[in-house]
Curated annotation (Swiss-Prot):
Lineage: Bacteria, Pseudomonadati, Pseudomonadota, Gammaproteobacteria, Pseudomonadales
Name the UniProt record assigns to this protein: Holliday junction branch migration complex subunit RuvB
Region Large ATPase domain (RuvB-L): start-end pairs: 4-185
A Pfam family of this chain: RuvB_C
EC number(s) from the headed UniProt entry: 3.6.4.-
Subcellular location: Cytoplasm
Residue numbers spanned by region Small ATPAse domain (RuvB-S): 186-256
Assembly with partners or alone: Homohexamer. Forms an RuvA(8)-RuvB(12)-Holliday junction (HJ) complex. HJ DNA is sandwiched between 2 RuvA tetramers; dsDNA enters through RuvA and exits via RuvB. An RuvB hexamer assembles on each DNA strand where it exits the tetramer. Each RuvB hexamer is contacted by two RuvA subunits (via domain III) on 2 adjacent RuvB subunits; this complex drives branch migration. In the full resolvosome a probable DNA-RuvA(4)-RuvB(12)-RuvC(2) complex forms which resolves the HJ.
Keyword DNA repair: yes
Region (Head domain (RuvB-H)): 259-352
C-alpha cells in the first residue's frame, strides 16, 4: 500500500511541474520567440481589432504538437485584454456542452478549442451559426411539440488548434477568418527559448549549453523545455548546478537523446523500416503493428519531424526511409537510393 505522504508528495510534484510550465509560457507577443511571420501578422490583426473595438476574427492555428498553439491562444486573449475559456474537441460530446460555454462568454472573449478536428458533426452544426452570426439555435421540447429558438451571443473569438488541419470539414475551415501554421523552430530560436526558460527557473546556463539542448529538441519548444528540466536535474546531482555544454551532452546521452534529437522510439521506427521492410515502402497500418504503436502516434508525433528532416518520405505505395536514415546509423546505402528513390515507388496503390 502506498503511504499517504507519498501520494501527497506525488501530487505536489506534478503541480510544481505544471506551475513551471505556466511560468515559462510567454504572455505577450513581444515575448513570443520564433514564428516571425505569424507573430507579425497576429500583431497587426490584434492591433486592428482593438482599434475598431471589435472581437478578433475566428482564428485557426495548426501544426505539429508542442509548437505553441495553446500558448498563442492565451497570448491572443492577453493582448486583446479579454478572458479565455479552454476546452477540447473530444470533451464537447453534445450540443449542450458547447451551448453552456458559448452562453457564458462575455463580449470579445476567446473560446479556445484544442483538437478541434475531433468535434462531432452534431456539435459542429451548432457551432456554424455561432461563428457566423453569433447566434445559438436551441431545440426546446421533443417530438411534434419541439421548436427551435435563437439566442443572440456576444461577439467572441473562436481559436481552434489542431495537428491535422486536413481533417477539418470545409464548412468549419471556411469560417475561420485567420489561419496560421506553426513551423518547426530553428536551433537559434530554440536556444533563445531555453535561455529564457532557464532564467525564469533561476538556472545558470552557458550559451553552448543552451545550444546543445536546442540541437536535440526536434525543433519543438515543448521538448526543449522538458529537456531543460531533465538537464537541470543532472546538473544538480552530478554537476555543480550550472548547465554547460559538457553537462548538457552527458545528460542528454543519459536520456538516450542523440545528436539529431532522435529518441529510442524514433530510432526504433527507422530501424524497423530498414530491417523488417527493407527500407519500405510500407503502409502505416503495417508499420503501426510492427511497432505496437497507435497509428496516430506515428502520424502526429514521430513522422512530422522525421519527414521535415528528410529521413522518411511518404509515397503513394507507403513510407520509405531515405539515404539519410542509413547514414545516421552507419549502414550501407542500398543502390536504389544512390542518386534518388526509384520512380516505381511513386506509382499505384495508396500508402495510407
Amino acid at each position: 500500500m502506498i503511504e499517504p505522504d507519498r501520494l501527497i508528495s506525488a501530487v505536489s510534484g506534478r503541480e510544481r511541474e505544471e506551475q513551471l510550465d505556466r511560468a515559462i509560457r510567454p504572455l505577450k507577443l513581444a515575448d513570443y520567440i520564433g514564428q516571425p511571420s505569424v507573430r507579425e501578422q497576429m500583431e497587426l490583426f490584434i492591433h486592428a481589432a482593438r482599434g475598431r473595438q471589435e472581437a478578433l476574427d475566428h482564428t485557426l492555428i495548426f501544426g505539429p504538437p508542442g509548437l505553441g498553439k495553446t500558448t498563442l491562444a492565451n497570448i491572443i486573449a492577453q493582448e486583446m485584454g479579454v478572458s479565455i475559456k479552454s476546452t477540447s474537441g473530444p470533451v464537447l460530446e453534445r450540443p449542450g456542452d458547447l451551448a453552456a460555454l458559448l452562453t457564458n462568454l462575455e463580449a470579445g472573449d476567446v473560446l479556445f478549442v484544442d483538437e478541434i478536428h475531433r468535434l462531432s458533426p452534431i456539435v459542429e452544426e451548432v457551432l456554424y451559426p455561432a461563428m457566423e452570426d453569433f447566434q445559438l439555435d436551441i431545440m426546446i421540447g421533443e417530438g411534434p411539440a419541439a421548436r427551435s429558438i435563437k439566442l443572440d451571443l456576444p461577439p467572441f473569438t473562436l481559436v481552434g488548434a489542431t495537428t491535422r488541419a486536413g481533417m477539418l470539414t470545409n464548412p468549419l475551415r471556411d469560417r475561420f477568418g485567420i489561419v496560421q501554421r506553426l513551423e518547426f523552430y530553428n536551433v537559434e530560436d530554440l536556444a533563445t527559448i531555453v535561455s529564457r526558460s532557464a532564467g525564469i527557473l533561476g538556472l545558470q546556463i552557458e550559451t553552448q549549453g543552451a545550444a546543445e539542448i536546442a540541437k536535440r529538441a526536434r525543433g519543438t519548444p515543448r521538448i526543449a523545455n522538458r529537456l531543460l528540466r531533465r538537464v537541470r536535474d543532472f546538473a544538480e546531482v552530478r554537476g555543480q548546478g550550472d548547465i554547460t555544454r559538457v553537462i548538457a551532452d552527458k545528460a542528454l546521452n543519459l536520456l538516450d537523446v542523440d545528436e539529431r534529437g532522435f529518441d529510442h522510439l524514433d530510432r526504433r521506427l527507422l530501424l524497423t523500416m530498414i530491417d523488417k521492410f527493407d527500407g519500405g515502402p510500407v503502409g502505416i497500418d503495417n508499420l503501426a503493428a510492427a511497432l505496437s504503436e497507435e497509428r496516430h502516434t506515428i502520424e502526429d508525433v514521430l513522422e512530422p519531424y522525421l519527414i521535415q528532416q528528410g529521413y522518411i518520405m511518404r509515397t503513394p505505395r507507403g513510407r520509405v526511409v531515405t539515404r539519410h536514415a542509413y547514414l545516421h546509423f552507419g549502414l550501407n546505402i542500398p543502390k536504389r537510393l544512390g542518386p534518388g528513390v526509384t520512380s516505381d515507388l511513386f506509382t499505384s496503390e495508396d500508402g495510407n
